[in-house]
UniProtKB/Swiss-Prot annotation:
Species classification: Bacteria, Pseudomonadati, Pseudomonadota, Betaproteobacteria, Burkholderiales
Disordered: region residues: 37-59, 224-276
Stated name of the protein: Large ribosomal subunit protein uL2
Molecular functions per Gene Ontology: rRNA binding; structural constituent of ribosome; transferase activity
Gene3D superfamilies in the cross-refs: 2.30.30.30, Nucleic acid-binding proteins (2.40.50.140), Ribosomal protein L2, domain 3 (4.10.950.10)
Pfam families per UniProt: Ribosomal_L2, Ribosomal_L2_C
Subunit structure and binding partners: Part of the 50S ribosomal subunit. Forms a bridge to the 30S subunit in the 70S ribosome.
Encoding gene per record: rplB
Main function: One of the primary rRNA binding proteins. Required for association of the 30S and 50S subunits to form the 70S ribosome, for tRNA binding and peptide bond formation. It has been suggested to have peptidyltransferase activity; this is somewhat controversial. Makes several contacts with the 16S rRNA in the 70S ribosome.
Length: 276
């Protein structure tokens, strides 16, 4: 994996930096693990925009990734190939099990073709292996961590991310996330050893607006450039300041204002990611 700066043959390519991985599979993905993905462009079933700045982009299939990894315990497997996934920042690995089944998993850092991977409580503590947290030594770097047992991985799934198992107390373990938050999870939740691969993803430079449009992301218009009917910052003769503290289009403060309302799981957060 390497960062490659393109030749400045145009203004768009002048500042472009790509992440190149020659080990990625260059052919088609594994067809039985593909699903159609219909474009919603940020709209709900009423046609109303629920997520702004979405639309367009290249068509692609969804790759069915196994985030649970709980029904192949004890069955040997090996990485058959590494693949690009347009649906996420991390790469994925096609794993072939001894019983002949193939599945996609998130490719861990350092994964190579032919590497053995294992699932279950007896799996060795090695990158790419998936175990219950009760069987993982304290201090181990982990990724693809479950929040609820059996629900599938929800924490530390994007490129270059990881978490650290800090402690185990009774039926709960404490995990420190990349954001600095320390969270309690049940010891029966599963996690994968190591970090997520493609760690240079954050160093890429997209280079031009069109490449962002290929990804299905539309432009973000500033509130002060809108009319008063469209945004609290809008209006005014000529170029004017917002005239108030920054807010969202719906009037919610947008600089550091906390909007978390899920009191049911607040007790599971040992240390917040905020410093104050």
């Amino acid at each position: 994996m390497a960062l490659v700066k393109t030749k400045p043959t145009s203004p768009g390519r002048r500042s472009m930096v790509k992440v190149v991985n020659p080990d990625l599979h260059k052919g088609a993905p594994h067809a039985p693990l593909l699903e159609k993905q219909f474009q919603k462009s940020g709209r709900n079933n009423n046609g109303h925009i629920t997520t702004r700045h979405k639309g367009g982009g290249h068509k692609h299939h969804y790759r069915i990734v196994d985030f649970k990894r709980n029904d192949k315990d004890g069955i040997p497997a090996k990485i058959e190939r590494l693949e690009y996934d347009p649906n996420r920042s991390a790469n994925i690995a096609l794993v072939l099990f001894a019983d002949g089944e193939r599945r996609y998993i998130i490719a861990p850092k350092g994964a190579v073709v032919g590497q053995a991977v294992a699932n279950g409580p007896e799996a060795p503590i090695k990158a790419g292996n998936n175990l219950p947290i009760r069987n993982i030594p304290v201090g181990t770097t982990i990724h693809c961590v479950e929040i609820l047992p059996g629900k599938g991985a929800q924490i530390a799934r994007s490129a270059g991310t990881s978490a650290v198992l800090l402690a185990r107390e009774g039926i709960y373990a404490q995990v420190r996330l990349r954001s600095g938050e320390v969270r309690r999870v049940h010891i029966e939740c599963r996690a994968t050893i190591g970090e997520v691969g493609n760690e240079e993803h954050s160093l890429r430079q997209i280079g031009k607006a069109g490449a962002t449009r290929w990804r299905g992301i539309r432009p973000t218009v500033r509130g002060v450039a809108m009319n008063p009917v469209d945004h609290p910052h809008g209006g005014g003769e000529g170029k004017t300041a917002a005239g108030r503290d920054p807010v969202s289009p719906w009037g919610t403060p947008t600089k550091g204002y906390r909007t978390r309302s899920n009191k049911r799981t607040t007790s599971m957060i040992v240390q917040r990611r905020h410093k104050r």
